[in-house]
Amino acid sequence: MTASYLPSIFVPLVGLVFPAITMASLFIYIEQDEIV
C-alpha cells in the first residue's frame, strides 16, 4: 500500500480549495462591511 498517489490528489485540492475559501471569506467580509 503506497501513498505515491496522494500528491496528485492534495496538490489540486489545496490549489483549488484554499483560494476558494479565501475568496469566499473575503466576499463575505466585504458584504458584511458594506451592510453595517
Swiss-Prot record:
Pfam families reported in the protein's UniProt record: PSI_8
Cellular-component GO terms for this entry: chloroplast thylakoid membrane; photosystem I
SUPFAM superfamilies, sorted: Subunit VIII of photosystem I reaction centre, PsaI
Topological relation to the membrane, as annotated: Single-pass membrane protein
Compartment(s): Plastid, Chloroplast thylakoid membrane
InterPro entries linked to this entry: PSI_PsaI (IPR001302), PSI_PsaI_sf (IPR036357)
GO BP term, pick one: photosynthesis
Sorted UniProt keywords: Chloroplast, Membrane, Photosynthesis, Photosystem I, Plastid, Thylakoid, Transmembrane, Transmembrane helix
Cystine crosslinks: none
Transmembrane segments: 7-29
Family, per entry: Belongs to the PsaI family.
NCBIfam families: PRK11877.1, PS_I_psaI
PANTHER family reported for this sequence: PHOTOSYSTEM I REACTION CENTER SUBUNIT VIII (PTHR35775:SF2), PTHR35775
Function description: May help in the organization of the PsaL subunit.
Protein name: Photosystem I reaction center subunit VIII
Species this chain originates from: Psilotum nudum
